[in-house]
Amino acid sequence: MVSKTFFLAAALNVVGTLAQAPTAVLNGNEVISGVLEGKVDTFKGIPFADPPVGDLRFKHPQPFTGSYQGLKANDFSSACMQLDPGNAISLLDKVVGLGKIIPDNLRGPLYDMAQGSVSMNEDCLYLNVFRPAGTKPDAKLPVMVWIYGGAFVFGSSASYPGNGYVKESVEMGQPVVFVSINYRTGPYGFLGGDAITAEGNTNAGLHDQRKGLEWVSDNIANFGGDPDKVMIFGESAGAMSVAHQLVAYGGDNTYNGKQLFHSAILQSGGPLPYFDSTSVGPESAYSRFAQYAGCDASAGDNETLACLRSKSSDVLHSAQNSYDLKDLFGLLPQFLGFGPRPDGNIIPDAAYELYRSGRYAKVPYITGNQEDEGTILAPVAINATTTPHVKKWLKYICSEASDASLDRVLSLYPGSWSEGAPFRTGILNALTPQFKRIAAIFTDLLFQSPRRVMLNATKDVNRWTYLATQLHNLVPFLGTFHGSDLLFQYYVDLGPSSAYRRYFISFANHHDPNVGTNLKQWDMYTDSGKEMLQIHMIGNSMRTDDFRIEGISNFESDVTLFG
């Protein structure tokens, strides 16, 4: 007679087998393990480059030279050194009462997303892989590579778990592998000025992203992914990063003779006409950073950089948070000071010119925005309550623009509440007399004009565009604000969650957002039809991309407004 003990032992053995940690083999024989989370195998905190510390601080990433053997990829790595995104949330709480106006089911996820990058370390070049449970190395699943945003001064891959995308892809019968990459931000990743340019280490953050993509090309097949079917996508500065990866090296996205990526999605971001790495903005940001770190920016290029590399992480973190422009919650001026810059290397020319001259990777893409992108940024100018105040504020952030250019902007964006953002709300939601006007300017300057520049310049590839309006008339003052799409993609399952995920998963699989989604047909953008998908809280519809033509066209043509 078989004992009860035997059956219990057998049952425990089966359970143990089912819950066994997933593994992957790298470099031929180095075994790493991850964690089974429900129906998703997760591998978190995998190094893809050597730690950018000591003499490697501010430099381009170097290939990982360690061993993966025995790595327990159970937890996200620390975020790269950065500003605290909680400062932005705190300001919005103070100015617009964020905690009161955001619906209950979105408030918690918003704060969770902001807190994803609290733990920081300069040793931060790690990535994460999410795949359907039990995926075999020969599965050849499409790969979705996520690049986070954060104004190029904060952000972390830990804020964006890929479980939801993987689960949805399995339910659709179109399984994918999801990868998220850390990259350096602020002065660590986008230090500008003469010194770093002469050293040849500009745009280190873009090189981090590229090094991550090279790792994917070399290794993702070991996790069941297909290196010949990689889609890159990102939001805000992540989308701007995607835009710059498309024009990197004049559109050459190859590595070892193969494309690093084969399609792209840009959410709330596109190419910006940044001035080059030795222009006034990045040079002054470099000088301020050195000054607050206790280094003499006038001592000579090599001496100043050596001084900065000798400082502790705490000293440099304090310096980054001590700028005299920090009264604008450390976002806008530093965003204009730190970011991808033409350097004659990875970015050989201004991004607008690279697109307009056809020097971009010829891959299909999706680009779109939230309707009221600028409302979450407008509080930086909360004290601008009259037209003269607004012009003075514009001159402050658009220092290269002439008075005539600024007057033109003000005439195209009048102070009428009914024409500002949140759009289509009449006289409502005017936090201050100029709030809606400033929010509209931000929306079109930073988001809508780069989107249209891209669409107009890339006539030889298939492209789709969208406008998201899911929070229209639901969130006072903010409307469908910048970043609200992330809540539905990564943190809640309601309303437009399935639209974002299913369209994007289909695009990763087929380079067409319409296959097997059970959603509204999304027509491809054409120059004649200007077809645009509109994403609502419930359902989607097609419309024409024909709003605010004159104002947005002015931003497209006058690059001095970005200086």
UniProtKB/Swiss-Prot annotation:
Q: Where is the active site?
A: 236, 373, 482
Pfam families to which the protein is assigned, alphabetical = COesterase
Segments crossing the lipid bilayer:
none
Keywords annotated in UniProt: Disulfide bond, Glycoprotein, Hydrolase, Lipid degradation, Lipid metabolism, Pyrrolidone carboxylic acid, Secreted, Signal
Question: In this UniProt entry, which cysteines form S-S bonds?
Answer: 80-124, 295-307
Q: Where is the signal peptide?
A: 1-19
Family in the record? Belongs to the type-B carboxylesterase/lipase family.
Q: What is this protein called?
A: Lipase 1
What lineage does UniProt assign to this protein's organism? Eukaryota, Fungi, Dikarya, Ascomycota, Saccharomycotina
Question: Which gene name belongs to this protein?
Answer: LIP1
